[in-house]
């Protein structure tokens, strides 16, 4: 009975020694245990190779714009539920989060030289006064960039003068806009040719994505800055 105590101590020492040896073998010695564990948990049998994320540039563009160009992305509203977005040089000019969009036409005026936002407003083209829109776009200065995104209905209140002014800004489709069409457009005061930055989706019960509305439009690209001389 007197040997029971010493035997227990010897047994405990042996167990501790064996445990230390086992841990050393498994973990590879001091300082390398964590990498060994990580290698086990990330072995081919236990790991899934993650796809590398594609790099995004200003406004989420897949490629950077050249020097002296402005990066932009415009998304029209979806039906009468999701508001439009206008992004320029990684700055959100208009969106539901900024609480500055509304039914109708959402328009941001930008200095074509500096890229600075001049003014942003929404114009109700269903129940609003079209004269408010005319007062906004008639006095534009040469070289001003005009970003437009529709939401719900862009055209019911449009008159001949409104369509003509947008056409003079470079639009091909302003003359044909109708009730609940989707429209995104970038034009400029003083352009000689039609803008390459425009999309138009007709409201048609045969092709509408939503009940009573066409699908939302999304457009992105690079706009050359205007020279100071115009």
Swiss-Prot record:
Record-linked InterPro entries: FAM3, ILEI/PANDER_dom, ILEI_FAM3C
Domain of life: Eukaryota
Keyword Secreted appears in the UniProt entry: yes
Main location: secreted
Signal found in the keyword field: yes
Disulfide topology: 59-87, 65-222
Keywords: Disulfide bond, Lectin, Secreted, Signal
GO annotation, cellular component aspect: extracellular region
UniProt domain GG-type lectin: residue ranges: 68-226
Subcellular location as annotated: Secreted
Gene Ontology molecular function, alphabetical: carbohydrate binding
CDD domains reported for this sequence: ILEI_FAM3C
Secretion signal span: 1-33
GO biological process: antifungal humoral response; antimicrobial humoral immune response mediated by antimicrobial peptide; ATP biosynthetic process; calcium ion homeostasis; gene expression; glucose metabolic process; insulin secretion; mitochondrion organization
Family per record: Belongs to the FAM3 family.
Protein name: Protein FAM3A
Organism per entry: Mus musculus
Gene name of the encoded protein: Fam3a
């Amino acid at each position: 009975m007197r040997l029971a105590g010493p035997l227990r101590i010897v047994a405990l020492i042996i167990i501790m020694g064996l445990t230390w040896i086992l841990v050393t073998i498994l973990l590879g010695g001091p300082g390398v245990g964590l990498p060994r564990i990580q290698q086990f948990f990330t072995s081919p049998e236990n790991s899934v190779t993650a796809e590398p994320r594609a790099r995004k540039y200003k406004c989420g563009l897949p490629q950077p714009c050249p020097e002296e160009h402005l990066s932009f992305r415009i998304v029209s509203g979806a039906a009468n539920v999701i508001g439009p977005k206008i992004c320029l040089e990684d700055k959100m000019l208009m969106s539901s989060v900024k609480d500055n969009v509304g039914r109708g036409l959402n328009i941001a005026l930008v200095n074509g030289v500096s890229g600075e936002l001049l003014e942003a407003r929404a114009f109700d083209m269903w129940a609003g006064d079209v004269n408010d829109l005319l007062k906004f776009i008639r006095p534009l200065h040469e070289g001003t960039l005009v970003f437009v995104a529709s939401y719900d209905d862009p055209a019911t209140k449009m008159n001949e003068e409104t369509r003509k002014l947008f056409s003079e800004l470079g639009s091909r489709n302003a003359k044909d806009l109708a009730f609940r069409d989707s429209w995104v457009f970038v034009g400029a005061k003083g352009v000689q040719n039609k803008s390459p930055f425009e999309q138009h989706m007709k409201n048609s019960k045969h092709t509408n994505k939503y009940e009573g509305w066409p699908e939302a439009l999304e457009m992105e690209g690079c706009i050359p800055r205007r020279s100071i001389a115009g």
